[in-house]
């Protein structure tokens, strides 16, 4: 029986995979944007089974994102290994909606182990996003980066530059040189350099990260070029198959196994259609990526010193696995009862977990969140969240909360962005009665999707959120036995990369526990458990 890789290998919001092999181990780094901690790090020994082993950016001294908007923050990390050290480049993008100019400070961090600790960041320029480092055989290191903006042209992507990097001094040296201006596909970004035999191979992403996304390859016998483009470029794209199961394919890089086989990592999206009879954002009628961009692998081979994808340009779901021993990992538990001193599979917005707003010790066995800003804020939000990784899933929690005013609220959220979310909240009405209500914000329009459900003086409620591909449905229970739907089925497509007119939508949907108290008193809520089950 032939063993296969099942794509996507990293499900849910895990874009821009950068892959590297170290001995018998494979590692992938993925983007995290405004979510903290920054840069997810994944590990495999067979390219089939993957596990999350940690994050690179865990301190605000490494990553300060306070005040950042949706889809700003950490763009496209590039992971390499040289001199017994892991090197990781990234951009912390500010003001991505700035047109001709963005603030895109880029950095490199290092670690002896993939699990860290990772160093403080070293600046490597502000040219654009998606920096990477290349380690040449002679010991020299080079920084590659895309250029953004600054010219009166319709395409703000100004090509790929390269500059030598002095690792001992921790600084760029010499002048940057443009080594590749891109092809007619446009939007040239994500440069990474590979050396094989007599050639340097520059691999870039082109076409933008929507349906025309693609992987471009060019080569040169000299590191500074000139670079010639692959004769059958692009080598990987979904653009020719509008309804490909893995759409948006691009942003790739190559890795060689210890047995001499080659694979390309790349991002992709699994789109769903609009619900029947419902039209939302007509320009995206070919589908919505509610899970965000994910990561996949394709088998590659070489011909005439050029890489090709073994199954053709369009990515496939089932891929022939390498000739390596299988190495599965233990499955993550579906339920977190908050007994351990740390949270599992959890992300927060823009800042790390802090005792000033979150505690696992003040009431052992419960997660205590202290209310701060509301969901629309770009600053202090008391939220812990988990990626949706399947189109059909159920999330459940038990909440204890004692609100006295409408300005104190806690509950369960389906979250894509500060202006793209649904929220089942427990709060109090103007009479001081405790109530449940489903609210939300879709593209800056606030909505109330249910009437108040008065629950008297109850301070405990069970909440459930079901994702059924195109719909979210909330329900509640006061005893954990009898459940009642609250509000209508809510369209899931607004909570997607294609769910709004803003082109800067690069993350994915999350299930989140959230508490707000805009009185400033930080009223707390206690959560007994958090359960996530896929169907």
UniProtKB/Swiss-Prot annotation:
Site for Important for catalytic activity, responsible for pKa modulation of the active site Glu and correct orientation of both the proton donor and substrate, residues: 130
Keyword Hydrolase (UniProt): yes
Temperature effects on activity: Optimum temperature is 35 degrees Celsius.
Organism, as annotated: Vibrio sp
Identification of the protein by name: Xylan 1,3-beta-xylosidase
BP GO annotations: carbohydrate metabolic process
Activity regulation (record text): Inhibited by Ag(+), Cu(2+), Hg(2+), Mn(2+), Pb(2+), Zn(2+) and p-chloromercuric benzoic acid.
Catalytic activity entry: Hydrolysis of successive xylose residues from the non-reducing termini of (1->3)-beta-D-xylans
């Amino acid at each position: 029986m032939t063993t296969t890789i099942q794509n996507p290998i990293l499900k849910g919001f895990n874009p821009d995979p950068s892959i590297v092999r170290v001995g018998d181990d494979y590692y992938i780094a993925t983007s995290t944007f405004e979510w903290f901690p920054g840069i997810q790090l994944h590990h495999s020994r067979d390219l089939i089974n993957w596990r999350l082993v940690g994050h690179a950016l865990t301190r605000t001294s490494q990553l300060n994102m306070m005040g950042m908007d949706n889809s700003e923050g950490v763009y496209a990390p590039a992971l390499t290994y040289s001199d017994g050290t892991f090197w990781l480049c990234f951009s912390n993008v500010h003001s991505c909606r700035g047109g001709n100019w963005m603030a895109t400070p880029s950095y490199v961090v290092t670690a002896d182990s993939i699990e860290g600790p990772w160093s403080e960041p070293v600046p490597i320029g502000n040219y654009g996003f998606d920096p990477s480092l290349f380690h040449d055989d002679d010991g020299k290191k080079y920084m590659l980066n895309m250029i953004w903006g600054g010219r009166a042209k319709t395409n703000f992507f100004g090509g790929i530059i390269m500059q030598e990097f002095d690792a001992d001094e921790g600084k760029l040296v010499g002048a940057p040189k443009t080594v590749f201006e891109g092809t007619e596909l446009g939007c040239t970004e994500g440069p990474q350099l590979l050396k094989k035999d007599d050639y340097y191979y520059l691999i870039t992403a082109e076409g933008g990260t929507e349906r025309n996304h693609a992987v471009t390859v060019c080569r040169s016998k000299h590191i500074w070029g000139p670079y010639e483009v692959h004769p059958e470029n692009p080598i990987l794209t979904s653009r020719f198959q509008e309804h490909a199961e893995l759409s948006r394919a691009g942003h790739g890089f190559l890795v060689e196994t210890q047995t001499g086989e080659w694979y390309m990592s790349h991002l992709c999206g699994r789109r769903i259609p609009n619900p029947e009879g419902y039209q939302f954002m007509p320009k995206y009628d070919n589908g919505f990526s509610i899970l965000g961009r994910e990561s996949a692998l394709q088998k590659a081979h070489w011909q005439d010193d050029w890489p090709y994808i073994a199954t053709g340009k369009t990515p496939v779901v089932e891929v022939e696995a390498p000739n390596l021993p299988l190495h599965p990992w233990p499955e993550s538990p579906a339920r977190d009862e908050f007994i351990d001193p740390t949270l599992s599979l959890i992300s927060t917005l823009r800042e790390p977990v802090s005792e000033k707003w979150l505690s696992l010790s003040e009431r052992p066995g419960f997660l205590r969140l202290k209310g701060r800003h509301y969901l629309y804020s770009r600053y202090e939000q008391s939220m812990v969240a988990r990626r949706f990784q399947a189109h059909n899933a159920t999330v459940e929690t038990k909440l204890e909360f004692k609100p006295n005013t409408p300005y104190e609220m806690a509950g369960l959220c389906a979250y894509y962005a500060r202006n793209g979310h649904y929220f089942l909240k427990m709060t109090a009405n103007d009479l001081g009665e405790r109530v449940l209500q489903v609210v939300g914000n879709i593209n800056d329009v606030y909505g109330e999707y249910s009437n108040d459900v008065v629950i008297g003086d109850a301070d405990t409620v069970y909440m459930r959120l079901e994702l059924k591909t195109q719909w979210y449905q909330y329900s509640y229970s006061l005893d954990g036995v009898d459940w009642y739907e609250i509000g209508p089925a809510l369209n899931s497509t607004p909570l997607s990369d294609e769910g709004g007119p803003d082109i800067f939508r690069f993350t994915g949907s999350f299930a989140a526990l959230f508490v707000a108290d805009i009185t400033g008193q930080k009223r707390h809520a206690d959560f007994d458990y958090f359960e996530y089950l896929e169907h």
